[in-house]
């Protein structure tokens, strides 16, 4: 199977409500790396069909100009997820985000239905990538097995709100309640060779706190962050983009490795 763009840059993933066509028609103007077209929590129960209709036509008709199109489907404990998958694949979504992932079997179950949909709609097998949202203590504890569950899986994302509820605590604003999950998830992702994204930050009146949080998760090793507002994109991109000093250092390391390799070849000859 081919897995296009599995390692592409994903610093920013901006959530968009599929129930509101006006929000999903031109988010590329804000230049996020990925958009998260949401069929789950943002969509009212009696609007799921309408949201899927909007999603399909957006995927088919709108040129998102290279922005990755991720779709968050409803959880496996709902009656919606199977049809969500069919619409995602039929429309040509790049990636499907699996909500409330707790085990490798959750990923396997979704993958089976994605493969069936690819065959049904004539999409190349393996062309639809997967990512897993960990939203519970069980999911976080199983992070490594989830990360290793599928060749399609690009990475895991923390869903802080639901995780905090499952932890039986509250969101403090300091992030202390999320640190254990963050550390376990990034270690699991790196061990498995996949990417890892931090949870959303919803207080748009505290952009200074948001900036400090983004700096912290970058230092922890995260690849990026889920976002709720276009104002947050530039902050994330600035922090996650290498400085000129870092680029020069990396180029120097690559050059030295290349020179060592050439010297080794000459010695063998």
What residue ranges belong to the model's regions?
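Expand to "…catalyze enediolate/carbanion chemistry for C-C bond making/breaking, isomerization
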Residues: 1-268
